[in-house]
């Protein structure tokens, strides 16, 4: 079942999304990934119109979660100063992929290369400079690859990232405006 109904509603109310500030506060739609494979997807959206109803939105989202089954929960839904912060928690990235009808990869750089990902993918170092996926210094590092235009918060420091991303904090990357995936981030 397409998730476009709920996501369409959430994104339809977006008037303005601001850039990420400190790594502690999420200010844009962000997928937070953890080393154990779990993930939290945070949606940030304008919710200031008087006809917006948080309870209706939560009810609609809960129906989508129940239709999906186990592996996904609504962890929070709140409005503060006209801004909606809505979070889904996923037991695994495979649940995230199926629920959101997208694809992603989490593993080591070496495993990604063994699975056919391109060795010549250009990456930007968090410390400056450039390298490719075949660089031996990152082969055993964690890698996350995704296709959606959504910021990602890693559970470790960013080492390098694809050229269609920008570093927005020690653990955060964000797609550049107008960019398309796939997006790559290598982290400790």
Locate each region found by the language model.
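Mature, soluble, non-transmembrane domains
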Residues: 80-188
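Short linear motifs at secondary-structure transitions and domain/linker junctions
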Residues: 8, 59-66, 158-164
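Bacterial signal peptide processing site
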Residues: 21-23
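C-terminal motif of bacterial Sec signal peptides marking the signal peptidase cleavage site
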Residues: 16-19
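Positively charged n-region of N-terminal signal peptides that target proteins for export
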Residues: 1-11
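N-terminal Sec/ER secretory leader and immediately downstream segment
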Residues: 25-80
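Generic hydrophobic, helix-prone segments enriched in Leu/Val/Ile
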Residues: 1-3, 58, 158-159, 185
């Amino acid at each position: 079942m397409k998730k476009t109904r709920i996501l369409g509603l959430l994104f339809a109310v977006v008037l303005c999304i601001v850039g990420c500030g400190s790594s502690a506060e999420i200010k844009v739609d962000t997928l937070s990934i953890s080393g154990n494979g779990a993930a939290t997807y945070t949606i940030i959206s304008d919710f200031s119109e008087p006809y917006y109803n948080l309870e209706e939105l939560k009810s609609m989202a809960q129906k989508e979660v129940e239709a999906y089954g186990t592996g996904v929960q609504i962890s929070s839904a709140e409005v503060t100063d006209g801004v909606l912060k809505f979070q889904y928690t996923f037991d695994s990235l495979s649940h995230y992929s199926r629920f959101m009808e997208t694809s992603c990869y989490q593993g080591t750089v070496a495993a990604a290369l063994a699975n056919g990902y391109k060795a010549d993918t250009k990456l930007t170092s968090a410390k400056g400079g450039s390298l490719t996926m075949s660089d031996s210094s990152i082969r055993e590092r964690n890698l996350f690859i995704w296709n959606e235009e959504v910021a990602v918060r890693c559970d470790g420091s960013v080492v390098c990232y694809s050229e269609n991303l920008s570093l927005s904090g020690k653990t955060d990357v964000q797609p550049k405006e107008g960019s398309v995936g796939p997006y790559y981030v290598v982290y400790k």
